[in-house]
Amino acid sequence: MHDTSLLINTDLPALQAAGDAAGILWTIGHSTRTWEAFVALLGAHRIEALVDVRRFPGSRRYPWFASDTMAQALEAASVRYLWLPALGGRRKAQPGSPNGAWRNAAFQGYADHMTSADFGAGLEQAAAMARERRTALMCAEALWWQCHRRLIADLLLHRRWQVLHILGETAVQPHQLNADARPVGRDLIYPPRQVGLFSAE
């Protein structure tokens, strides 16, 4: 399940005043949008930098979302572009994975990947960008809860970042931590759910 509450006011100072967050990051999925619609959506939220978290940043059906093409077009729109393959999805679950709460193999594999040194370095690059500019993490999937952005958002939230999922030109959705997430220092794991002795399951 995911929270469906929306935040209409996306004014940055107001959001920062709402709490003691380490910073704010947005997320967005390019989906099947035209390039013009995508740039308009970034502009509506005043996004100044885009961090591409696709592992394979190409699209045959939507070639304007290929990495090289995007980098040039975003520069023309005064938006900085950074591809971070270390944050990309399509990861395999590891033997002895501590993340058995995920029944989706792709999400379990990504949860395993999030404890790797490569992921940690990539996330710090994204955070560094977000400290300087109004930054969004981008993947292809429109719905954040069907994308590995949801796991990145969990970890950012655990580390005191505020995460806002862009849904449209006038609305974002504040991220809420997955109920299965458990802190291990600065990291998170999603251990298998415990079934009670007298449970009907």
Regions found by a protein language model. Name each.
Residues 1-201:
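Residues lining hydrophobic/aromatic ligand-binding pockets adjacent to catalytic sites
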